[in-house]
Amino acid sequence: MRLRIITACAVAVSTAAALAPPAQATPKRDRFDVVNLVSDVRGKAAITDPKLVNPWGLAMGKTLWVSNTGTGTATVYSGQGKKERTEVAIPGGAPTGQVFNRGDGFTVKGKPATFIFSSPSGAITGWNAEADPENAIIGAFTRGADYKGLALAETDDGAFLLAADFAGGRVHAFDEDFKRIKLSRSQFRDRSLPDDYHPFNVAVVNGNVWVAYALRDPKTGKSVAGDRKGFVSRFDLNGRLTGRISRVGLNAPWALTAAPRGMGRKYAGALLVGNFGDGTIHAYRGGRHLGALRGADNRPIKLPGLWDLEPGTAATGGENTLWFSAGMDGGKHGLLGVIRPAGAKGSAPRLPGADNRSKSPYGGY
């Protein structure tokens, strides 16, 4: 099947202008604050949620969905981290990557999956509130696969999924019926990389497919951390290799997204890469390393166990923010928060209590 892309339904920079910070707050140029919002550890963040253990993939619909690898669930948050009532169990357990599906494909029990999840068990599952409000449903299963990341795009023939198989060292594709698409030996593959670097994540950012590669320990099946231990390759939306970014700053990279416009002129629209290996976040433009995101103290931001990064919206977090998820203490605990320009406030107000929630018992997803 030839993949001809018309649009990408994954990470993109918001086209809306970021709201200006309040007059009393003067953001420091190219410096950022980290705000902890939710954790399973009491006192670590403003909100305590015992389900938030080793939070991995993030997906933004009307609200923010979080894949909790440690509890086999997906939980939902709005505003500045307020937990919604929706809570979904993921069959196959340990959800990793996650995408929001706007289309009519990828049906589960006759309904299009609103959110789709990948799992190290080789399962890809979908959730629709009408099909089953409390459980995702298995749509595809690949024996022996270890899916660490997931992306969604659209083609002339419909949408398709891309899943990073960390065990097999390949990117797999699935059509809207959750059936595997047979790819050529060169599609979504960087054959010049060392054999022990495997796809750790895949994302669609700024109209390109990006694949993050990490060094895989064959004995444990886990990623290996270390300075410049990682690659990030760029493909067009037909799977043809078109480039590779600098290895400067890479350390078991996983998160891939575009910097929101509200993060300032230097970074707006740049590719942001978050390292699982050392918890730092680096920006790249045209393949060139722009530097690490730094805190107000001018030190590189470090978030131990960093997994995903997701731009905020006017309703959820703010248009000048970047959501992050991290599996603290070696994945035994979890942290969800935002990164925003130093001195700035979130451009979205904290939502009031339950009276303002969606009338749906499953929240506004």
Q: Which role does the model predict for each range below?
A:
Residues 24-365:
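Sequence/structural signature of beta-propeller domains
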Residues 1-25:
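Secretory targeting and sorting signals
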